């Protein structure tokens, strides 16, 4: 179930009706990921971000994609204006991983919140391919992801 309905952030409210089981950023949800040994998908943006709105319409409102994301990850939506520290930490990681950054900032992390993959806006098919490949790595070779996160 989407957990954003009671959030005060305009950005989080924009995503409250998405079929994705979004959670707001909290220590509790990070602890849940660790206890369930489930990967995190953290999506960071802000209410006036053009590409954030495009990604929501093309990807986050799509039931098929939401079903995959809900199965594969614990999904966290972050308003960068509410959590500039989280945005800064993961933007630094995205730049280290990919050489660039921007918003929406999408990060996949191990259950311990260490990032292993980052992207900004991706078209629908690229997004589906990426989350499917990440899921396969998690299923077949989680040790490779853990080694990569330690670098």
Cite the ranges covered by each PLM segment.
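Replace the tail clause
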Residues: 1-151
């Amino acid at each position: 179930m989407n957990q954003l309905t009671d959030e005060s952030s305009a950005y989080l409210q924009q995503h409250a009706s998405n079929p994705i089981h979004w959670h707001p950023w909290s220590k509790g949800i990070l602890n849940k990921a660790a206890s369930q040994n489930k990967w995190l998908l953290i999506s960071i943006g802000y209410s006036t971000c053009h590409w954030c709105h495009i990604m929501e319409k093309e990807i986050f409102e799509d039931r098929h994609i939401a079903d995959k994301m809900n199965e594969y990850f614990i999904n966290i939506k972050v308003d960068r204006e509410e959590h500039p520290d989280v945005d800064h930490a993961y933007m630094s990681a995205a730049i280290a991983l990919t050489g660039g950054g921007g918003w929406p900032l999408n990060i996949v992390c191990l259950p311990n919140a260490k990032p292993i993959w980052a992207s900004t806006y991706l078209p629908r098919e690229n997004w589906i391919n990426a989350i499917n490949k990440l899921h396969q790595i998690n299923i077949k070779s989680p040790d490779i992801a853990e080694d990569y996160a330690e670098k």
